[in-house]
From Swiss-Prot:
Stated name of the protein: FLYWCH transcription factor 2
Low complexity: bias regions: 111-140
One MF term in the entry's GO annotations: zinc ion binding
Protein purpose: Probable transcription factor. May bind to the promoters of target genes, including micro-RNA genes, in order to repress expression, and acting redundantly with flh-1 and flh-3.
Region (Disordered): 102-148
Keyword entries, A-Z: Metal-binding, Zinc, Zinc-finger
Intrachain S-S bonds: none
Protein source organism: Caenorhabditis elegans
Protein's GO biological process: negative regulation of DNA-templated transcription; nematode larval development
Taxon lineage: Eukaryota, Metazoa, Ecdysozoa, Nematoda, Chromadorea
GO cellular component: nucleus
Amino acid sequence: MVDTMMNTNTDGVTAVPPIFPLPSTTPNRNNNNELAMLAQKQIVAGLLLQQPTIVQAAVNGTNSQKHLADIDYTNVIQTLQALGTTNLKAFSLLLDPQSQTSQLISEDTRPSASSSPSSTATAVSNSGQSNATSTSSSSTEPEYKPRNVREKVYADGYIMSFDKKSCCGTKEFWRCERKNDCNARMHSDINTREIVRKLHPHNHEKPSPEELAFYEQDFSTLHPNYCHPVKSINRSYMQRKLSRASHVSQALPIAPQQIKAEPMEVDTTNQTIQNFQQNNNLMLLASINAAATAAAAATSAGISPPVVGQKRVSTTVMPITLKSQRTTPKEEEDSSQLMSQEEFRITYELTKKLMEMMKPKTEIGVRWQGDEGSILLFLSHDNGAEENVFFPVVVMNRDEKSLITALEGFTGKRCEGKLALCYSQRVNVLVHEALISNWTHGKLFLVNTDAPALWRLTPVDAFGEPLNHV
């Protein structure tokens, strides 16, 4: 029975209509379009007629070259060349064995597809596979990631940003997310994400709990020696959110339960109210007495009471209400700190005495009974010792020459350069007559003669500390 059906189907196949031959003369553009449309229709009709026979032969395993020989490929190639000369778009067909209908899938606008005959044949034969491939590939497309967004991880309490992979392909390099300010770097294993090396410590504090809350992840359970992926959050966006939240929290009003008056303020307010009530009562009593006195005086003077139609004059004096000046706790504290004149004088005298006692002794109190033009100084060698012994030296005249002569006699050396006062390591002032004339008796100096070109005198106080004035 199967053989009978196969013979019947084979005998019932209609012959393929011939392809419209290509004319020898070159037609105009309109004739080319009509020719291409007619050739296209005939190719589709021939393929549809061949489809049932080809499918049945493939199912029974009796497929042969018999049916393929019915198609004139020479005419097909000539027709496709005609399509290419008229610049028409190539087309592809999807042949469905079940529905036995053709469906137009896509059109390619590239000229290379229309100029090549093999490309059109390949599109027709592989149209079914391309549709299935496109459907399966759409479901397995990778997740879209925007450009210039690097992966971020949480490692050792900090947020790190991906930098690059090593040339050997076994390590990943990470940088601190504040890469413009912080130079910290880190290397991790590419498979286990374990930290294998740390370079350059961070120059900032670890992210605060408020900043970590943006990542919506519990970081307390994570191992500090591994890299844990986190969401990629823009740091400037995070800072704006935190700044706005801090401003809002500062602008919120204080709850009534949080407002508690200080004891001093409560007592002061109660006392002010009591004083105001007492003053008001006294003023009211005085006004009543004044009104009674005025009424008695009017009666004794014979003044008749006002009659109807006249304007009544009120003899009642209303009490004057004075607005109390409420003082703040700060004003009361300032007023309580004010001293009387006597207390201020005593405090001033004590402070003056203390300042005089604390003032460093820059000279030794001596009574000079010699010549008024000479001066008595106490000199010691500046040799870096902790204790210095000062010797009295008399300068005969208040000038530089006499001072150098006295120093040469004290040191036993000859001064071949200048003489300067050393106030610090950087400040040296040359000695001159106007400076020496203001000196008083008993001043202390350390003499340094290490540099022959410049001898230095360092003024010190009674404790051996250098002075910045003489």
